[in-house]
Design a protein with these regions (language model features):
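Membrane interface segments of multi-pass transport proteins and intramembrane proteases
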Residues: 104-114, 145-154, 163, 317
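Juxtamembrane helix-capping/reentrant segments at transmembrane boundaries
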Residues: 44-57, 108-122, 308, 313
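Carboxylate/His-rich catalytic cores and anion/metal-binding grooves
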Residues: 117-134
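Alpha-helical transmembrane segments
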Residues: 2-35, 65-102, 129-149, 171-347
Length: 347
């Protein structure tokens, strides 16, 4: 008799299904509780005028998403140091996002924690994650260049500090890359959370790509974590689709953004993430180019940044922007996964 429950593919699929079912079942109660406590979204006055109707929509859906992901990960019972580190990054940045969300709700304004406080918090989490990944998770400081079989050694400038009986290895260049990846990804995912279903949909696609990569690497624990996150986002989308009944808030976008960065680091696809998570690169670049152009020339490149608002201002419906961004995400993530797969086969 074949015990299908022991099959890794079955376990990954089960993780997705359980996360979807849990979120679909629990979010109505979560939404009801948020409405009862008047915990609603504060909308920017300088954003698209059509978004003003979203004022007061329940937010902080990311709390339940992260709780479900954690519960499914524990329930599946397949633990590993790297997946635990990735989950810790999700929870830590999710907690920072929660403070930001709560600050907005308490003050009844669209601005929560100051950018300086958020960057400091993200930076501290990134540095701690990097140190633990190298010293506890044994993540290499080498960065693989896709399709070449060549790697860059970012551990050439390394310090070793003695802490009691422990030697703490600090590869400065690699730690800088981790810092940059964690901060840029959390914030660009946060930028993408500006339309109903946009962030959750793109995160789902990229998480599925990383579930496949981790599975290919025989890291079942990491694959299960990514699969659970993808499933939770799908369940959340049931209520976040336009017109949204709930938003994930910074709790979700910062937490899941950190999770994506962590997955790229622990699967050693740091450079390939530029393609797999290319939609977030596009979103971030649109803001950088907009600000730089305005400061240098006094003119704006886009009607509004990030770029998804530009298309809204061109007359695209919110749903059309969302679906087309999903398509672009799928193409980029699929291309990145294909490059990874071909590279490992050749290797």
């Amino acid at each position: 008799v074949i015990d299908i429950a022991t099959y890794p593919t079955y376990q990954v699929f089960l993780g997705i299904v359980l996360a979807v079912v849990a979120c679909v079942a629990l979010f109505p109660l979560w939404i009801k509780m948020l409405r009862y406590r008047n915990i609603g979204q504060q909308v920017r006055a300088d954003g698209p005028q059509g978004h003003l109707i979203k004022q007061g929509t329940p937010t902080m859906g990311g709390v339940l998403i992260i709780l479900v992901v954690t519960a499914i990960y524990v329930l599946m019972g397949n633990f590993g140091r790297l997946s635990l580190l990735a989950l810790a990054a999700v929870i830590a940045c999710g907690a920072l996002g929660f403070l930001d969300d709560w600050s907005k709700v308490a003050r009844e304004r669209s601005l929560g924690l100051t950018p300086r406080i958020k960057i400091a918090g993200q930076g501290a989490i990134a540095l701690l994650f990097g140190l633990l990944a190298v010293n506890w998770g044994h993540v290499s400081s080498e960065v693989l260049i896709p399709m070449t079989g060549v790697s860059l050694d970012l551990g050439v400038y390394t310090s070793i500090f003695q802490l009691g009986s422990y030697a703490i290895v600090v590869p400065w260049l690699y730690l800088g890359l981790v810092f940059l990846m964690m901060i840029s990804t959390t914030n660009t995912v946060n930028l993408s959370d500006g339309l109903d279903g946009l962030a959750a949909g793109t995160i789902t696609i990229v998480m599925l790509a990383y579930a496949g990569i981790a599975f290919r690497q025989d890291h079942l624990d990491i694959a299960l974590l990514a699969a659970a996150a993808a499933g939770a986002c799908v369940g959340f989308l049931w209520y976040n689709s336009h017109p949204a009944d709930i938003f994930m808030g910074d709790t979700g976008s910062l937490g899941l953004g950190a999770g994506l960065a962590a997955l790229a680091i622990i699967t050693k696809t740091e450079l390939l993430f530029v393609l797999i998570g290319g939609i977030y690169v596009i979103q971030g670049l649109s803001v950088i180019l907009q600000v730089a152009s305005y400061k240098l020339t006094g003119k704006r490149i886009f009607k509004m940044a990030p770029i998804h608002h530009h298309f809204e201002m061109l007359g695209w419906s919110e749903t059309k922007v969302m679906v087309r961004f999903w398509v672009v995400t799928g193409i980029l993530a699929g291309a990145g996964f294909a490059l990874y797969f071909v590279g490992t086969v050749r290797g």
